[in-house]
Amino acid sequence: MLEAKSLRKATVPRSLLQHPSPGNVQSNRLALHVNDDNSSCWVYIASGCRIYKLEISMQDSLVNRGKESLLIPEQCEVMNSSLVNHCPHRSEIQSIALAETERSDCLILGSVDSYGHLIVSKLDNSGKDVDRLTFSALPRDCGVGEGGWAGICFSPSQWCMAAVARSFCKSIDVYDQDIHLQTIRTLWYPSSLCFMQTLCSGNDSSLLAVTEGCQLSIWDLRMKENGGCVHRICGSLGDIFYTVCSSSTNIAVGGADRTVTIYDPRRWSALSRWVHCSKYEITGLAFSSIDSDYVYVQGVDYEVLCGQWRDSKKVLSFRGDSNWLGFSKCANRDVLGGWCDSGSIFLADITKENYIQSTDGLSNGVPS
């Protein structure tokens, strides 16, 4: 079973950012990176046309629980904060994402604004300013028309490959660095996307999962027939999907029906449905990196919960203090971060229960 090692709450300094810009219902304006020594975590947040970074301690602390085992955060201070030396956008940033490269000392930061303008920069792994590598890409229509929600995701095997979704345009553009590879036309307004990590797709990351309206569509970037669409799954009519995520074996979707549905990509059949696990609409999902039988669920009502999707059993949860402006999970470990419009940042470090018990035993001189 998973347990929380720590849950911390920090506040964005007013001197750095006083009034964050409002975001879309999909909270994609936050990204996380834990330092190599696990002592602190860099939190990247986007507001308006700029990106900011904050360093928050990751030291273990006593986790307090309230009613119904709700985790109570411990107040902490922001260790460092600054404006990221990232080329500014011309319109409001809608989504940001971090990707790791072959080198262990650098990260890739990508951002996309409401017109689909993509900017990618290389960051120092220690949280220092941007390196010299920066490139940008515009959609084929040069971002004309009405702006709206836009999303970005990097390929897990090729950091240089990124997919950008634009809701109002019903399109997804795929890039290799600043080279436009192809455009996917969706039937409905896309609301979330991710490269699939399933075993059946191998390591080439050619499969892209997209939520559009009440449908989950699967696209093979190597195919031309049907525009590359290889499968469609329809949810409940009228219940919009807001989020999709993938593990090495399964894929999960959630949305307005407050239900997490897990699919087997080998047969495209539903393995499990965790019905009404959230009080309101689900706008964020992530499989646990420790045990993919667990899934993290973010709801509109400030709540974040973790549970076993096979048994529909909640094991832990915490709440923000206002609407989420950004929410994310680290790529290879169970560290969750959320940013509220009050300026509060919540940072949760999750691990296996037996790990906490073993470390407690060692600290008391008793072998586990």
What does each model-identified segment do?
Residues 46-50, 112-116, 165-168, 212-213, ...:
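Short, flexible beta-strand-to-coil junctions
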Residues 27-29, 40-42, 48-51, 93, ...:
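A common structural microfeature
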Residues 24-34, 88-100, 140-154, 186-201, ...:
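Canonical WD40 repeat/beta-propeller blade segments in eukaryotic WD-repeat proteins
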Residues 39-44, 103-110, 158-164, 182, ...:
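Structural hallmark of WD40 beta-propellers
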Residues 1-18, 37-87, 115-136:
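Beta-propeller domains
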